[in-house]
Amino acid sequence: MTDHTLADADEGFDLDSVEIRVLGVLMEKAFVTPDNYPLSVNAIVTGSNQLTGRDPVMNLTETEVQEALDRLIARKLVSKRDQASARVGKYEHLVRLRHSLPPPEQAALATLMLRGAQTAGEIRQRSERMHRFDDIAAVDKVLEHLGEKYPPMVAAVPKAPGTKETRYAHLLGGRQAFVQMGEAVASGYGSGGAVRGRTSELEEEVRRLRDEFDVLRSEFEKFRSQFE
């Protein structure tokens, strides 16, 4: 394609790990810190290197972030906003416009970009500051939409031995990067990984039970209101 976009129609997505992190940070901060958005390069560096909410944790330099921003601008995924009152330029993502993603899809995709492969329950919990999903079914619907785009933006990772929950990963790094991510997920289920995986499944089950309880409580309140 002469017009560079996020994906090539034949080969799919091909962003590198730094581009994915930088773009994910811009998407996240647009939700959680709207008063400080768009972001300066320094703010993007800080967001990229956070110790929480990031997997893997990275230690990017200002130069690496700036070069990634330049490449993303060339792909028309990021724009630089120069303001007369600002001493430095600031950057904003264009994913919503380029790929017609509503807020729920942006939130789920950003969560996958910043934290790696996750279950639908984990995505729901971890994306809460960006978008509050009513239940896991709502997350499943969003993941389905992202997986049906052309080229697809999300896919299910093959289950590791001994796991029940399906994990999902973004496809923005290309098919090979997705395969490597799946292998990393599977290799994480050694002695310690299996325990972490089981813990995650139990946490997921607790969240499911809470969802069901909330539904039952809501139905009971509606029933009781008929007699008041």
UniProtKB/Swiss-Prot annotation:
Q: What's one Pfam family here?
A: DUF480
Membrane-spanning segments: none
Family stated for the protein in its record: Belongs to the UPF0502 family.
Question: Know the name of this protein?
Answer: UPF0502 protein AZOSEA09860
